[in-house]
Amino acid sequence: MKRDHQEISGSGSNPAESSSIKGKLWEEDPDAGGMDDELLAVLGYKVRSSDMADVAQKLEMLEKVMGTAQEDGISQLGDTVHFNPSDLSGWVQNLLIEFNGSTTTPDPNFNDDSEYDLRAIPGVAAYPPVKSDPGLEITRKRAKTESSSSSSSTTTRPVVLIDSQEAGVRLVHTLMACAEAVQQDNLKLADALVKHIGLLASSQTGAMRKVATYFAEALARRIYRIFPPDSLDPSYNDKLQIPFYETCPYLKFAHFTANQAILEAFSMASRVHVIDFGLKQGMQWPALMQALALRPGGPPAFRLTGIGPPQPDNTDALQQVGWKLAQLAERIGIEFEFRGFVANSLADLEPEMLDIRPPEIEVVAVNAVFELHPLLARPGGIEKVVSSIKAMKPKIVTVVEQEANHNGPVFLDRFTEALHYYSTLFDSLEGSGVAPASQDLAMSELYLGRQICNVVACEGMDRVERHEPLTQWRTRMETAGVSPVHLGSNAYKQASMLLALFASGDGYRVEENNGCLMLGWHTRPLIAHLGLATRWY
């Protein structure tokens, strides 16, 4: 095996600036107790913060009384429903009177003011309750609206009993409200909202809770400008990609469909050269090498150029991957040559560095799986790389990218799109059949969580997760003179068979879009594979 190693020095992104918030972001208003609660005001309600403890105390008393009433066989109010009351405190007091008799004395410390609408009190999910019995679960019960007659002549009024589904809706609305406050640079409101997001998320389970937690963390990092020290370390992401590869079919689909396109392009060639823009652990290439070894007429001479980022411990990870692939090539009888290039950015590469041979001697393929979108953070980066690709004169260029729009100019739009996109991804992870407590699943979620943090918390050159939809990539490439090619129905059929390995394929969908392949969860496309060819061919 021949192997060369080169390091390309280039200007990378500056490390994310970290700053800690000293003291408070704003001064507290000493008269704030009489003001409207700003968290609820932004959601459209008028509620005084000073009223909340009193209402919570009355709800606690009502829970105790209702429990006693059920034991005594008094059930006329057990199914009473009170829908959208304008005076929640007064209604609770009336119920206490009906249970305990007209001699019950209202709490002297509670001042009722019907001017304020207490409908929106989120309960224990959003506000820590006053000390109460563990049985206080009024926010967890199913909301229902039905009427029943009481022993008195007064008209029955409905009550809102909030369940976890309603809390989930409120969680999403609060996430959106916090993102809007961030966009408007309202740090006081954003700070209040992001704290309540964590409390609301605790009332959820499964994918919703995990997604909300990651988005809350990302919002908090953006608000307080606190970033993890390894937020821009690509080598760490490369390691996290391994369990993500094992847990769900997205990377396997990307590698499989790219290999199929490359294999078809190499069908008649005696010498082939693959330039991998992101070698990582080299997981994509053993399958292609084995397919080439079985080719009728014998395998071609296979040359692989792998590009990767510098390692924090200065180890030569590319060399280690190259040696493993060389051992495989020797076992299956393929002539193999490997070269590794260390680069901070693909924009630092020049075609002359890669020893490109004439097309009549060697057929070239360029492979870019989730590698092009970070170039959008660097002015002129994507244009430079596309120009280099054209100079390499490849027969096939395989591009796999996230089918999402996380690169718009408006923060709230990016946040909304990211919330929908990653909610679907986390949902698919839970449906992939992996044990919920497995380490691979936890690492896969961390892999996606780091992407969420970058999309939401970072800006400028530090924001590298700039995903764009297939239509934009196709237009960009066509404008640069790199034309899409049809991937073929064979790749579609085999990709569909691949999905059967993951929870029998339930939920995953492959679709063809103008010659491109997309993999999604139910009706939402999540990644797209675009095959390209230079006009030289």
UniProtKB/Swiss-Prot annotation:
Residues 320-352 are annotated as: Leucine repeat II (LRII). GO terms for molecular function: DNA-binding transcription factor activity; sequence-specific DNA binding. A motif (VHIID) lies at residues 272-276. One of its GO terms (cellular component) is nucleus. Residues 9-20, 147-156 have a biased composition (Low complexity). Residues 241-306 are annotated as: VHIID. This is DELLA protein GAI.
